[in-house]
Protein backbone atom coordinates (compact mmCIF):
# COMPACT_ATOMS: atom_id res chain seq x y z
CA UNK A 1 0.00 0.00 0.00
CA UNK A 2 1.31 3.39 -0.94
CA UNK A 3 0.45 6.83 -2.25
CA UNK A 4 0.72 7.32 -6.01
CA UNK A 5 0.77 10.52 -8.07
CA UNK A 6 -0.14 10.42 -11.74
CA UNK A 7 -1.32 12.51 -14.67
CA UNK A 8 -3.98 11.48 -17.19
CA UNK A 9 -4.72 12.97 -20.60
CA UNK A 10 -6.36 12.43 -23.97
CA UNK A 11 -2.97 13.23 -25.53
CA UNK A 12 0.25 11.22 -24.96
CA UNK A 13 2.29 12.58 -22.05
CA UNK A 14 6.01 12.82 -22.81
CA UNK A 15 8.67 11.54 -20.48
CA UNK A 16 10.43 14.07 -18.28
CA UNK A 17 13.44 12.08 -17.06
CA UNK A 18 15.13 12.81 -13.76
CA UNK A 19 18.41 14.50 -14.79
CA UNK A 20 20.16 13.04 -11.74
CA UNK A 21 19.52 9.37 -12.56
CA UNK A 22 20.99 7.20 -15.28
CA UNK A 23 20.91 3.47 -15.94
CA UNK A 24 24.10 1.74 -16.99
CA UNK A 25 25.33 -1.63 -18.13
CA UNK A 26 27.94 -3.31 -15.94
CA UNK A 27 30.61 -2.49 -18.52
CA UNK A 28 29.64 1.21 -18.57
CA UNK A 29 29.80 1.31 -14.77
CA UNK A 30 33.25 -0.30 -14.77
CA UNK A 31 34.45 2.12 -17.46
CA UNK A 32 33.39 4.99 -15.17
CA UNK A 33 35.46 3.49 -12.36
CA UNK A 34 32.47 2.49 -10.23
CA UNK A 35 32.65 -0.30 -7.69
CA UNK A 36 30.38 -3.08 -8.89
CA UNK A 37 29.06 -5.88 -6.63
CA UNK A 38 30.83 -9.20 -7.19
CA UNK A 39 27.67 -11.03 -8.29
CA UNK A 40 27.46 -8.71 -11.33
CA UNK A 41 30.99 -9.73 -12.34
CA UNK A 42 30.12 -13.43 -12.59
CA UNK A 43 30.66 -14.93 -16.09
CA UNK A 44 26.94 -15.68 -16.58
CA UNK A 45 26.02 -11.98 -16.20
CA UNK A 46 25.82 -10.10 -19.50
CA UNK A 47 28.21 -7.17 -18.97
CA UNK A 48 26.57 -5.23 -21.82
CA UNK A 49 22.93 -5.66 -20.75
CA UNK A 50 21.42 -2.17 -20.49
CA UNK A 51 19.66 -0.84 -17.40
CA UNK A 52 21.48 -3.12 -14.95
CA UNK A 53 22.78 -0.45 -12.57
CA UNK A 54 20.99 2.72 -11.44
CA UNK A 55 23.42 5.61 -11.01
CA UNK A 56 22.75 8.98 -9.38
CA UNK A 57 24.89 12.09 -9.21
CA UNK A 58 23.25 12.98 -5.88
CA UNK A 59 24.50 11.82 -2.52
CA UNK A 60 21.75 10.54 -0.24
CA UNK A 61 22.28 10.99 3.49
CA UNK A 62 20.22 8.52 5.48
CA UNK A 63 19.57 9.19 9.15
CA UNK A 64 18.46 5.89 10.73
CA UNK A 65 16.55 7.86 13.38
CA UNK A 66 14.57 9.93 10.84
CA UNK A 67 11.46 8.49 9.15
CA UNK A 68 12.45 9.97 5.76
CA UNK A 69 15.72 11.06 4.17
CA UNK A 70 16.58 14.57 5.30
CA UNK A 71 16.90 17.44 2.84
CA UNK A 72 14.82 17.88 -0.27
CA UNK A 73 17.66 17.94 -2.79
CA UNK A 74 17.60 19.96 -6.01
CA UNK A 75 14.28 21.11 -7.47
CA UNK A 76 14.77 19.16 -10.69
CA UNK A 77 15.10 15.84 -8.80
CA UNK A 78 11.83 14.38 -10.12
CA UNK A 79 10.51 12.59 -13.18
CA UNK A 80 7.35 12.04 -15.20
CA UNK A 81 7.19 8.51 -16.66
CA UNK A 82 4.57 7.51 -19.25
CA UNK A 83 2.80 4.32 -18.22
CA UNK A 84 2.19 1.52 -20.69
CA UNK A 85 -0.74 0.15 -18.69
CA UNK A 86 -3.10 1.60 -16.13
CA UNK A 87 -3.08 0.20 -12.62
CA UNK A 88 -6.30 -1.37 -11.39
CA UNK A 89 -6.68 1.35 -8.71
CA UNK A 90 -6.69 4.18 -11.27
CA UNK A 91 -10.15 5.75 -11.69
CA UNK A 92 -9.38 7.86 -14.77
CA UNK A 93 -11.01 7.14 -18.09
CA UNK A 94 -8.34 8.99 -20.04
CA UNK A 95 -6.21 6.77 -22.32
CA UNK A 96 -2.76 8.20 -21.48
CA UNK A 97 -1.25 8.17 -18.00
CA UNK A 98 2.13 9.10 -16.56
CA UNK A 99 3.57 8.60 -13.09
CA UNK A 100 4.93 11.64 -11.24
CA UNK A 101 7.95 10.48 -9.24
CA UNK A 102 9.72 12.49 -6.56
CA UNK A 103 11.05 11.58 -3.13
CA UNK A 104 8.97 14.28 -1.53
CA UNK A 105 7.29 17.48 -2.59
CA UNK A 106 9.15 20.79 -2.66
CA UNK A 107 7.93 24.18 -3.95
CA UNK A 108 10.60 24.08 -6.67
CA UNK A 109 9.37 20.68 -7.87
CA UNK A 110 5.82 22.01 -7.79
CA UNK A 111 6.89 24.96 -9.95
CA UNK A 112 8.61 22.67 -12.49
CA UNK A 113 5.59 20.34 -12.58
CA UNK A 114 3.34 23.36 -13.18
CA UNK A 115 5.55 24.28 -16.17
CA UNK A 116 5.23 20.70 -17.47
CA UNK A 117 1.43 20.83 -17.07
CA UNK A 118 1.24 24.14 -18.94
CA UNK A 119 3.25 22.65 -21.80
CA UNK A 120 0.94 19.62 -21.98
CA UNK A 121 -2.19 21.78 -21.97
CA UNK A 122 -1.10 23.15 -25.36
CA UNK A 123 -2.09 19.72 -26.77
CA UNK A 124 -5.33 18.98 -24.92
CA UNK A 125 -8.34 20.75 -23.45
CA UNK A 126 -8.22 18.87 -20.16
CA UNK A 127 -5.63 17.12 -18.02
CA UNK A 128 -6.08 15.23 -14.75
CA UNK A 129 -3.64 15.29 -11.81
CA UNK A 130 -4.34 12.44 -9.38
CA UNK A 131 -3.12 11.43 -5.93
CA UNK A 132 -4.45 8.01 -4.95
CA UNK A 133 -3.88 5.32 -2.38
CA UNK A 134 -2.83 1.98 -3.91
CA UNK A 135 -4.33 -0.83 -1.87
CA UNK A 136 -6.25 -2.89 -4.41
CA UNK A 137 -9.61 -1.50 -3.27
CA UNK A 138 -11.73 -0.17 -6.09
CA UNK A 139 -14.28 1.68 -3.99
CA UNK A 140 -12.37 4.66 -2.61
CA UNK A 141 -14.37 7.85 -2.28
CA UNK A 142 -13.28 10.47 -4.83
CA UNK A 143 -12.74 14.18 -4.19
CA UNK A 144 -12.42 16.12 -7.40
CA UNK A 145 -11.93 19.79 -8.25
CA UNK A 146 -12.02 21.54 -11.61
CA UNK A 147 -9.33 24.21 -11.95
CA UNK A 148 -8.74 26.39 -15.01
CA UNK A 149 -5.09 26.30 -16.05
CA UNK A 150 -4.87 30.07 -15.65
CA UNK A 151 -5.79 29.69 -11.96
CA UNK A 152 -3.65 26.62 -11.14
CA UNK A 153 -0.88 27.51 -8.66
CA UNK A 154 2.10 25.87 -7.03
CA UNK A 155 0.06 25.98 -3.80
CA UNK A 156 -2.66 23.84 -5.48
CA UNK A 157 -0.03 21.32 -6.54
CA UNK A 158 1.38 21.33 -3.00
CA UNK A 159 -2.07 20.67 -1.54
CA UNK A 160 -2.68 17.67 -3.79
CA UNK A 161 0.87 16.31 -3.51
CA UNK A 162 0.83 16.38 0.30
CA UNK A 163 -2.59 14.80 0.92
CA UNK A 164 -2.76 12.88 4.21
CA UNK A 165 -3.95 9.33 3.55
CA UNK A 166 -4.02 8.36 7.25
CA UNK A 167 -7.79 8.97 7.45
CA UNK A 168 -10.17 6.07 6.91
CA UNK A 169 -11.43 5.28 4.39
CA UNK A 170 -8.65 6.31 1.99
CA UNK A 171 -9.90 8.91 -0.48
CA UNK A 172 -8.61 9.42 -4.03
CA UNK A 173 -8.07 13.02 -5.16
CA UNK A 174 -8.15 14.51 -8.65
CA UNK A 175 -7.65 17.98 -10.06
CA UNK A 176 -9.26 18.30 -13.49
CA UNK A 177 -7.26 21.05 -15.14
CA UNK A 178 -9.07 22.76 -18.00
CA UNK A 179 -8.20 25.38 -20.63
Describe each PLM feature range.
Residues 1-179:
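Structured alpha/beta or helical-core interaction and ligand-binding surfaces enriched in interleaved
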